[in-house]
Amino acid sequence: MKRNTTHNLTVAAMLSAVAFILMFIEFPIPMLIPSFVKMDFSDLPALLGAFALGPVYGVVISFMKNLLHIVVKGTSTACVGELCNFMLGAVFSAVAGFIYKHHKSRKTAILGAAAGAAAMALFSVPSNYFITYPAYVEFYHMPLEAILGMYQAILPSADSLMKCLVIFNLPFTLVKGLLDAVLCMVIYKPLSPILHGRK
C-alpha cells in the first residue's frame, strides 16, 4: 500500500509538472473564436492521471498545475483565471475518471472521456458568465461591450454574453476536451508501464 501511494504521488507530481508546461503551449483559432480564447492541451495529463490513478488524482493534478502557474508566473486576475481553469479541468477529469473507475475497459474510457468533455463544456458557460468574464471586466478594465465586439467581429448577431458563450465557448471547450480524449487514447497504452509502475 505504501509503495502504491508513493508511486501514485510521484506520477501525479510528474503529470502536474507536464500539465504546467503545456499551459504555456497555447495558440488561438482565428476566425472561429476571439484570439484571447486559446487552445491548449494542459488538461491531458489530468485525464491520464484520472484513468491511471483515479478521479481524485485527476482533480489534484488540475489543482497543482494551476498552483504552479500562480507561483511561477503570477496572476493578473487575483487567481480567478486559474480558479476557473482548475474547475473546468477538475470537472473533465473527475467525470471521466469516475466512469472509468467502475468498469475499466477501452469502451468506458472513451465514454468517460466524452462525458467529461461534455460536462466541462456545459460547466464552461456558467463559470465564464458568472466568474471569468466579470473578472476580465474588473481586472483588465475591459468594458463588456469590447469583449462582445470581439465575438461580433466573427458573428454580428452575437449580441449578448450568454449567446457568445453558448455559440462559441461551449463548442470550443467541447472540441478541446475531445481532442484531449483522442490524444489520451493514443498515448495511454505506451505510457501505461510508467503510469502504473510496471516494467
Can you say where each PLM-predicted feature lies in the sequence?
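Loop-helix junctions at membrane interfaces
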Residues: 1-199
